[in-house]
């Protein structure tokens, strides 16, 4: 099976056997063999050979290819949404919004490039100061499974726009989405070698990250893998490394007037995408007392009614499946562990079908747990922590190695300003779902959540490096020579 796209040609893999499964039915969606180290190297070399010509194209010529790619996505939007839903388990309504985000990324990236990394100049007394940006060269892009189209697209589009060439390794759990995406690039007329696709799991990823021919690596995924990459690239300032990782995100609730609005926002923050967004709320901080009791009771009541189902089920469910049976089992095990440590299951997360990766929402009160794990439970498992006062809530919110997203539900602007100032996170929302983000704003966090603002407006910053120049059209002696020099 032709599973890799290298130097403009599809070819079969020479590495480990791979399968992509529908997480609900367990039907085989895609199968092939991963790329071995020699194929990874061939992809890097193909990108290296294509780089000079691609980088020397005018910006407008590269934009033309990107816009044709967006047009191809529009043509194939239904098939792409179907594939995303089938491979990830997310409902079709959500898969369709992901394709829309992929399409919109082109215009956003062009605007960002012009504003943040375009050419600027200013006159000096005897020269012109010019700021331009140059591409790094060949960059590797590692994509995640939760948004297999949108998130790698957020690296690839600005990287190509800046003049880089790319070797793309998607998640081994979503190879078909990657294949469809690359086919859209081919149909858009992207020259051979500019974008290369290598499918595979750990073997392929290790070979790509270690290949001396790459000038950088852009990664979106788990903190565990991101930390390994960070260690691998330690002492290599010659390589650009952009990491967008996870979070143990807190959502603090104040005593707001509209209880149901708070409940709805919590659900959208914790359980959308079956809890498989890096910005999902993992910890819900609720005030002690009668108001907090009422909020939790209402939250549990509503969460019991949340519909869970297959990606194409009608009427459409709110939540689809998690990515795999393995992921579902790990989440169920995490719930058991929290209970063993003293957590109280307010709403037990269950697996309605033993052979399907469908999970119902789970809510565990971990207030009494002394050694709460600072982990990202990547699924529909929400931990509740009761707090005595607002300062204690902020302290608990910041009690994490991560720093991706934090949110406050409060009727008080003063409280929000106080919260915003003290929060340690790259995204801080007020009375909006934690998973909400603006495409024109930076996306990313601090601490163990990453180092750059990946896949969004500020992606332009790490896809090219600034070059400062002093320029004048003719060489001439200055009117006054430096002391000690005679001509």
From Swiss-Prot:
Gene3D superfamilies reported in the protein's UniProt record: Aldehyde Dehydrogenase, Chain A, domain 1 (3.40.605.10), Aldehyde Dehydrogenase, Chain A, domain 2 (3.40.309.10)
UniProt key word Calcium: no
Residue sites binding NAD(+) per the record: 221-226
Pfam family, one: Aldedh
EC number, as in UniProt: 1.2.1.71
Domain of life: Bacteria
SUPFAM superfamilies in UniProt: ALDH-like (SSF53720)
GO biological process: arginine catabolic process to glutamate; arginine catabolic process to succinate
Active site: 244, 278
InterPro entries documented for this protein: Ald_DH/histidinol_DH (IPR016161), Ald_DH_C (IPR016163), Ald_DH_CS_CYS (IPR016160), Ald_DH_CS_GLU (IPR029510), Ald_DH_N (IPR016162), Aldehyde_DH_dom (IPR015590), SuccinylGlu_semiald_DH_AstD (IPR017649)
Coiled-coil features, chain-numbered ranges: none
Classification via PANTHER family: ALDEHYDE DEHYDROGENASE-RELATED (PTHR11699)
Free-text function comment from the UniProt entry: Catalyzes the NAD-dependent reduction of succinylglutamate semialdehyde into succinylglutamate.
Protein name listed in UniProt: N-succinylglutamate 5-semialdehyde dehydrogenase
Organism in which the protein naturally occurs: Pseudomonas putida (strain ATCC 47054 / DSM 6125 / CFBP 8728 / NCIMB 11950 / KT2440)
């Amino acid at each position: 099976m032709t599973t890799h796209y290298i130097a403009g040609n599809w070819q079969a893999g020479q590495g480990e056997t791979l399968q992509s499964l529908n997480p609900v039915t367990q039907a085989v969606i895609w199968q092939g063999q991963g790329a071995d180290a020699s194929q990874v190297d061939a992809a890097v070399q193909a990108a290296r050979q294509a780089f000079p010509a691609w980088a020397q194209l005018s910006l407008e010529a590269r934009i033309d290819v990107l816009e044709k790619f967006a047009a191809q996505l529009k043509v194939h939007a239904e098939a792409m949404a179907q594939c995303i839903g089938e491979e990830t388990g997310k409902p079709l309504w959500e898969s369709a919004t992901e394709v829309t985000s992929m399409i919109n990324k082109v215009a956003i990236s062009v605007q960002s490039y012009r504003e943040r990394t375009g050419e600027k100049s200013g006159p000096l007394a005897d020269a012109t100061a010019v700021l331009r940006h140059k591409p790094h060269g060949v960059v590797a892009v590692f994509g995640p499974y939760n948004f297999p189209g949108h998130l790698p697209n957020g690296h690839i589009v600005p990287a190509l726009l800046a003049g880089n060439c790319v070797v793309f390794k998607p998640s081994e759990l979503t190879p078909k989405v990657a294949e469809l995406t690359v086919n859209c690039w081919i149909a858009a007329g992207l020259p051979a070698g500019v974008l290369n696709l290598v499918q595979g799991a750990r073997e392929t990823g290790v070979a790509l990250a270690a290949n001396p021919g790459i000038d950088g690596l852009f990664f979106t995924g788990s903190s565990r893998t991101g930390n390994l990459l960070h260690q691998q690239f330690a002492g290599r300032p010659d390589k650009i490394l952009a990491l967008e990782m996870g979070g143990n995100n807190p959502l603090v609730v104040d005593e707001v007037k509209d209880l149901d609005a708070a409940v709805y926002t919590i659900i959208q923050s914790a359980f959308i995408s079956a809890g498989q967004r890096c910005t999902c709320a993992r910890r819900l901080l609720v005030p002690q007392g009668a108001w907090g009791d009422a909020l939790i009771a209402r939250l549990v009541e509503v969460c019991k009614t949340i519909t869970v189902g297959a990606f194409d089920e009608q009427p459409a469910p709110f939540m689809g499946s998690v990515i795999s049976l393995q992921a579902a089992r790990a989440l169920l095990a995490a719930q058991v562990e929290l209970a063993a440590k003293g957590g109280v299951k307010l709403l037990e997360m269950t697996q309605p079908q033993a052979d399907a990766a469908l999970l119902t929402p789970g809510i565990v009160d971990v207030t009494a747990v002394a050694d709460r794990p600072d982990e990202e439970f990547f699924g529909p498992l929400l931990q509740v922590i009761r707090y005595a006062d607002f300062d204690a809530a902020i302290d608990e919110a910041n009690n994490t190695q991560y720093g991706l997203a934090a949110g406050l539900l409060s009727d008080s602007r003063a409280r929000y300003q106080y919260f915003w100032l003290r929060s340690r996170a790259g995204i801080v929302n007020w009375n909006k779902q934690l998973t909400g983000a603006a495409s024109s704003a930076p996306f990313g966090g601090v601490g163990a959540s990453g180092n750059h603002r990946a896949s969004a407006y500020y992606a332009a910053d790490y896809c090219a490096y600034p070059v400062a120049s002093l320029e004048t059209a003719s060489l001439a002696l200055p009117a006054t020579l430096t002391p000690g020099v005679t001509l």
